A protein has these predicted regions:
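C-terminal soluble interaction/assembly domains
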Residues: 245-307
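Structured, acidic catalytic/metal-binding patches in enzyme active sites
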Residues: 31-247
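Sec-dependent N-terminal signal peptides
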Residues: 14-22
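Sec/Tat signal peptide C-region and signal peptidase I cleavage site
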Residues: 24-31
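Bacterial N-terminal signal peptides that target proteins for export
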Residues: 2-15
């Protein structure tokens, strides 16, 4: 990786979106349906769409249901307002919060044996040791994952979020965010060093299978296959339960009242967040259903509040 250029392009506009990720028989797939739902408001419709934050060039096209939802919407809401995002905001956050004190190195923090494992994986994808040797474990994991992602041909610039942001800007549709980059990255920065170290080691060990994992996610996303997405969620959560509960469940609960407030507006909205935010007992679909709302998959039937 040319470290700073990728940080600016991929991290500043795509890294925050990489925060990708209970039984769900009531949320089963219907063939040909994408991960797009509609919620009827008092005077409007709020569309919900699961995003894949990075896509390869040959699979970057929108599913028809997402095209329909975008065309019918007057404004877009994303995890972070990419339209107003300062390109250096994520880089600045990493510099200020993700860099170790001058007296420490990553090897000092995680130990020589674990550091050797991480560097071996970094070397396998041609990531220079100097790119992560002075970072806190969580930040090193982000850089390692971002670089591995780019090496597979998955480009954050082609992710659904980025494409929608660019299109909305061109079409003059307002864009808003559910949270800030600092809030997103702060979830990782607030973890203990032991938790961060585990997160880094998990990220490093995932590198060899990243291509296969992403391919499975895209297939499930395009099909609206929530059972397959649920399997991906369980796999991710098993590695770091507390972290993923905060990444998904806690954030979903914070977003819920903001999404519900949109149902009282006069214009239609398209809310776009990572696809894994919709699955599980603390997923947005379950939370909305429990609040009395009836998300309807396009085309499809209402989601039940019970399994």
């Amino acid at each position: 990786m040319k470290f700073l250029p990728v940080m600016r392009r991929g991290l500043a506009r795509g890294l925050a979106g990489l925060l990708l990720l209970a039984s769900l028989p009531g949320f089963a797939r219907a063939d040909g349906q994408a991960a797009v739902w509609a919620l009827k408001g008092t005077r409007n419709t709020v569309y919900l769409a699961g995003s894949v934050h990075a896509l390869p060039k040959d699979r970057a096209q929108f599913p028809p249901q997402l095209e329909l939802a975008y065309d019918a919407s007057d404004a877009i809401v994303m995890e972070v307002d990419l339209d107003d995002l300062n390109p250096l905001e994520a880089v600045q956050f990493l510099t200020e919060r993700g860099t170790l004190p001058a007296s420490q190195t990553l090897e000092d923090v995680i130990g020589a044996e674990k550091y050797s494992t991480v560097i071996a994986l970094a070397n396998s994808i041609d990531l220079p040791e100097m790119a992560i040797s002075r970072l806190e474990p969580w930040a090193a994991a982000m850089v390692l994952t971002q670089f591995a992602l780019m090496r597979t041909g998955f480009d954050p610039q082609l992710g659904i979020d980025m494409q929608l942001s660019d299109r909305a800007r061109s079409d003059g549709k307002p864009i808003d965010g559910l949270e800030t980059v600092g809030e997103q990255l702060g979830i990782f920065d607030s973890r203990s060093m032991s938790e961060q170290t585990k997160f880094l080691l998990d990220a490093a060990r995932d590198v060899p299978e990243m291509q296969k994992d992403l391919d499975r996610l895209i297939v499930a996303w395009r099909a609206g296959d929530l059972r397959a997405l649920e399997r991906e969620f369980r796999k991710e959560r098993a590695q770091s339960p507390a972290l993923y509960d905060e990444l998904l469940g806690t954030r979903n609960r914070k977003w819920l009242p903001k999404i519900e407030a949109l149902l009282n507006e006069d214009r239609n909205y398209l809310v776009v967040v990572g696809t894994l935010h919709f699955v599980g007992r603390d997923g947005l679909l379950a939370l909305l259903a429990k609040s009395g709302h009836k998300p309807v998959m396009l085309p499809g039937t209402p989601v039940s509040a019970t399994n």
